[in-house]
Every structure is written in structure tokens, then in C-alpha cells.
Amino acid sequence: MEGECRVLSIQSHVVRGYVGNRAAMFPLQVLGFEVDAVNSVQFSNHTGYAHWKGQVLKSQELHELYEGLKVNDVNKYDYVLTGYTRDKSFLAMVVDIVRELKQQNSRLVYVCDPVMGDKWNGEGSMYVPQDLLPVYRDKVVPVADIITPNQFEAELLSGRKIHSQEEAFEVMDMLHCMGPDTVVITSSDLPSSQGSDYLIALGSQRMRKPDGSTVTQRIRMEMRKVEAVFVGTGDLFAAMLLAWTHKHPDNLKVACEKTVSAMQHVLQRTIRCAKAEAGEGQKPSPAQLELRMVQSKRDIEDPEIVVQATVL
């Protein structure tokens, strides 16, 4: 029997829908992981709806929760997973917790989605306070092992713009030098040979040989765009990448193929259901576009590969 693998996931929580911990816990549990969730916020629903209500966890409250685990000697983890955060002091507290957990378990893997912003029509903009960037760059990324920025976030962290695949890999090398051995740029506006209906994702994994030298595996994936606005996809991606890199630690190609293929199955099912609910010619609402997670259990568990990665 395989040993227990436990994840501490510090993310947002919604009562209705699938973002943050709600998007991460189910797939991780389906794939055999124990998940301990700290809810950085508790909202009625995600903020893409017309209204939402709820509470935000303060950094001191995060510290209290962690201390509770510590005094009971149950703060033993194999992975830490974090996503969207708006507060600088909360993010700094996360770093303190990760550092302490790594002192206890030097093999702990920290998976971080450095959520800061995105590009729309070629223009990048941040949707978190700007004072989070130096915390991510100088404190979070150096303790992270796997990071999943989009192109804009990779540019922010490295201080360099990406105009080509070559420049993207130069940026990823810079990010490797900052700390993480695995960097996946989850989406970019780089051109696809298959046309403008496709998004490019890039992955780079630095592996250490027994003699101390390193070898880097690089991959490229082309994914068909889905014409809808989904929320929670980045959280789902990071959780599944955690799971599949655990199961395929030296094969980023397979880990990314399984992650992205499962994502495609979830998104296609979601858009089919949303369109059917909305009715012909009607635009689906945020509630109708909530990820069909439970219905996609089999695809999450054993995804049919529908997106191939090219090793470069």
C-alpha cells in the first residue's frame, strides 16, 4: 500500500461553486491525497457574480490555525499548495509556515500559483495590490518548488517581457535560478502553428543528477481555446499538476499531458452543460459556468490524453 501523502492547501473557499480550495480538494482527494484546507476567505460565491458576502481570514488568524496544528503535532506535510491572496501580511505568514514545514521535512514540495494578473487583448494588468509583487518575487518564489504563472505573471516576476518562445525559456531559466525546479507557464499569447484558436503553454523542469549536475526538460503544449469565462481553472490546474508531478516526478511531459487533458474534459463538459441550461442563443451566467467537477470524476482520475506535449 502506498504511503499517505498529505497536502496543506491555503486558498479561498466558496459555499457555492468551485474556486480555490473547492476547486483543488476534490481532484486531489480523487487522486488519493489527504488534503488539510485552510480557507483564506469564506465567501458565498466567487466575485464574478453580481453579489457576494463573506469573511476574510487575517494573517494572525492563519497563524493561530497553524499553531493549533503544531501543538497537537499534526503539522506534518508532503506538499503545500497556495493560490490567490490579496494581503501582503497574509502572504508573508504563508512563507513563514512553508519555511518551518520545510525545516521539518526537507522533501516537502511547495506548489505556488502566483496569482497577480493577466493579459487582455495584449495588455497586462494586475488584479491584486502592487505591493504583493516584491513579496512573491523576493520571498515566495525562492521557497517554492513548482510555480504555475501565466505569461504576464512570469514577466512580472522576472522583470522581462516575453515576445518569443526563446525569450519565454530565458525567463523560465531566470525563475529556476530564483528557486523553483518546475515552472509551467499556463497560458501565453505566443503564436500557434494551428492558428489563433489555440493557446500555448510551456513547461520547464530542472532535475539534479547524482553527480550534482542538472538537466532541464522543456515542453510545449497547444490547447484549443474555450470561448467562455471560467473561474477556478488556475486552482484546478495547480492542484492536478501537484498530483501528476507526484505520480510522474521525472516526466513533466506526462504530468502536463494528464493535467491539461483532464482540464479540457472538465471545461468541455462545463460548457456543454452551461449552454444547455442557458438555452439556445443565450449567454450562460456565472452560476451556469461553475466547473462540473463531480460529474468529471472519471476524467480527473484517469484522463484520456487529448492534448499532447512536445519535448523541445
Swiss-Prot record:
GO BP: pyridoxal 5'-phosphate salvage; pyridoxal metabolic process; pyridoxal phosphate metabolic process; pyridoxamine metabolic process; pyridoxine metabolic process
Binding positions for Mg(2+) per the UniProt entry: 118
EC main group: transferase
Annotated residues for binding of pyridoxal: 12, 47
EC number per UniProt: 2.7.1.35
Compartments where found: Cytoplasm, Cytosol
Key words of the record: Acetylation, ATP-binding, Cytoplasm, Kinase, Magnesium, Metal-binding, Nucleotide-binding, Phosphoprotein, Sodium, Transferase, Zinc
Catalytic reaction list: pyridoxal + ATP = pyridoxal 5'-phosphate + ADP + H(+); pyridoxamine + ATP = pyridoxamine 5'-phosphate + ADP + H(+); pyridoxine + ATP = pyridoxine 5'-phosphate + ADP + H(+)
Binding site for Na(+): 113, 148, 186
Regulation: Activity is increased in the presence of K(+)or Na(+).
Residues modified to Phosphoserine: 59, 164, 213, 285
Pfam families: Phos_pyr_kin
Keyword hit for Transit peptide: no
InterPro entries in UniProt: PM/HMP-P_kinase-1, PyrdxlKinase, Ribokinase-like
Pathway: Cofactor metabolism; pyridoxal 5'-phosphate salvage; pyridoxal 5'-phosphate from pyridoxal: step 1/1; Cofactor metabolism; pyridoxal 5'-phosphate salvage; pyridoxine 5'-phosphate from pyridoxine: step 1/1; Cofactor metabolism; pyridoxal 5'-phosphate salvage; pyridoxamine 5'-phosphate from pyridoxamine: step 1/1
Function recorded in the entry: Catalyzes the phosphorylation of the dietary vitamin B6 vitamers pyridoxal (PL), pyridoxine (PN) and pyridoxamine (PM) to form pyridoxal 5'-phosphate (PLP), pyridoxine 5'-phosphate (PNP) and pyridoxamine 5'-phosphate (PMP), respectively. PLP is the active form of vitamin B6, and acts as a cofactor for over 140 different enzymatic reactions.
Name of the protein described by the UniProt record: Pyridoxal kinase
